[in-house]
Amino acid sequence: MEILGFTVMGGGSPAWIEVPEKSKSAFWELMRRKVHRYVIFKIDDRREEIVVEKTGAPWESYDDFTASLPADAVYDLDFVSDDNCRKSKIFFISWSPSLSCIRAKTIYAVWRNQFRHELDGVHFEIQATDPDDMDLEVLRGRANRT
């Protein structure tokens, strides 16, 4: 049976969506090598795999990042902690505006959980439906609580 373009297996859950090495590599380059400030992912047109839609250079700002949304992405936040130490935390940001169509939200909800578990090394997850949910100060506040 097919639901929203996904093949449904016996348990009623959508089929596994492939996470190619190129997508995983983009995340590792962000996390380990600091090659990217952010990576934005999407489901390919065939709905078979998660691909990199865009990467941001290390010098790009949070405003550059948010201008590329809505999408699901990882963001490497550099900040100065409350005890005056330079730190970096990686956020998985799931941006699904409340006005998005239900079909799109459903498709992305299916892959989001699976994909998030592929990204070992993410410190925080933010599920945003409004720009205020992912304001830079929200990220800084979450990062400083650790």
UniProtKB/Swiss-Prot annotation:
GO molecular-function terms, A-Z: actin filament binding
SMART domains: ADF
Pfam families, per the entry: Cofilin_ADF
Superkingdom assignment: Eukaryota
GO BP term, example: actin filament depolymerization
Gene Ontology annotations for the cellular component aspect, listed alphabetically: actin cytoskeleton; cytoplasm
PROSITE patterns linked: ADF_H
Residue runs in coiled coils: none
Keywords: Actin-binding
ADF-H domain: residues covered: 14-144
Family note: Belongs to the actin-binding proteins ADF family.
Annotated function: Actin-depolymerizing protein. Severs actin filaments (F-actin) and binds to actin monomers.
Protein's UniProt name: Putative actin-depolymerizing factor 8
Species: Oryza sativa subsp. japonica
